[in-house]
Amino acid sequence: MDAATSFGCASKGPDPLWRYLTEHDPKYERKKKLKISGRELASVPTQIFSLDQLQVLEMSPERESCLRYRMELLPQEISRLRNLTCLYVDSNNLKKIPAEIGTLSHLERLTLSNNNLSSLPPEMGALQRLHSLHLANNSLTELPSPLCQLRSLTFLDVSDNKIGTIPSSIRQLEKLETLLLLFNSLDSLPEDVCLLRNLRTLWLGNNHLQSLPTSFGELVNLDWGYNYCSCNFEGNPLESPPPEVCSRGPEEIKDYFLSFHRTQRH
């Protein structure tokens, strides 16, 4: 199974390449992959859980496959696939993730977007090789605590949820480069976010933020050419600092707060 294999849709035959993955990262072109598809499938084929050398598994109805079946529960047997590095189960009807996912110690990418998840199992904190996690468009009301144990994480998307607070433990994600928090219910950010010195992309649009942490200007690695104001802060009732200051980058934000503190002292 050196080339990508398509399970189902026999009339179309196997795909010579799994284009979605190779477009996103050539690193995964030579992986042992499986794409579940087929309009007649009514459940996940149990045979796949005997493929213990499988490295990339896609079970997402709205990708290039013709899969109509939408999972409501990720099978516990997923734990048998100990060599998985990438798991794509977005655009299903998942309401929970089994604790067994914590046994997938080689997992590097996990896509859970467009489901109905309101929590994550504590066992997910064991995924210490995970560097990319997609959780957009779910039903999360807080940033699940297991996420803050994922020390290798460089990309985290929790956009379009109902998240109201960010825990101080987010400071543990020291390698994080991209944090997407758009379309949530945040009315504040902890100062701890400002300790994520490797952040290059931070999207906060369409929340309820009236102010930024006073240390926000310390995030000097933010790519302000890409994170201009309309992307970064649009849709927030910001007052401190005002949007026109934010759009000028970290130095202006730092100067704003320094000036503000001097005024307060006098």
How should each PLM-predicted stretch be described?
Residues 1-100, 104-168, 175-178, 208-210, ...:
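The feature captures the LRR N-terminal capping module
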